[in-house]
């Protein structure tokens, strides 16, 4: 499956009606080359990997693309509809609640794509990169907060 921005816009409209009751506003889309992320959401923009190289494949299959794209749309939903722009905990309770709702109603399981499915296929360098990012995002601010409180 070859990805284009037009295809992303078309799928956004389709999935918006199917999973979000047409609540989401159209956002911007970008395709990018990456080694370990399949998708990413930044304020008002959904980034999708051109090819899922980390999964050992060169092309997307339909189910994997749908799970990844709807996953990023849930981030867009939490940010725009719920008004919560959480960068520290992007997969917090609002994200998980909407994801479980979609899984319960439609059987679409997006929670298994949060670094779980692909982690085993990464190189040691990529795994260290992920852990370094986690340390910067979660552990350092948490330790700072604890030292500031106590």
Question: Which residues does each predicted region cover?
Answer:
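Metalloprotease/metallohydrolase-associated module, dominated by Zn2+-dependent proteases
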Residues: 1-63, 80-150
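Active-site recognition of the HExxH zinc-binding catalytic motif
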Residues: 67-80
């Amino acid at each position: 499956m070859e990805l284009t921005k037009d295809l992303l816009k078309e799928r956004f409209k389709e999935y918006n009606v199917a999973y979000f009751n047409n609540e989401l506003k159209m956002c911007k889309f970008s395709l990018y080359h990456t080694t370990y992320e399949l998708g990413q959401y930044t304020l008002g923009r959904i980034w999708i990997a051109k090819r899922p190289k980390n999964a050992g494949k060169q092309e997307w299959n339909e189910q994997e693309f749908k799970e990844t794209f709807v996953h990023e749309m849930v981030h867009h939903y939490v940010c725009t509809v719920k008004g919560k722009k959480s960068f520290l905990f992007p997969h917090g309770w609002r994200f998980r609640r909407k994801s479980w709702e979609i899984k319960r109603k439609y059987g679409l399981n997006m929670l298994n794509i949060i670094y779980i499915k692909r982690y085993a296929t990464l190189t040691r360098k990529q795994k260290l990169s992920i852990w370094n990012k986690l340390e910067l995002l979660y552990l350092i601010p948490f330790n700072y907060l604890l030292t500031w409180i106590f």
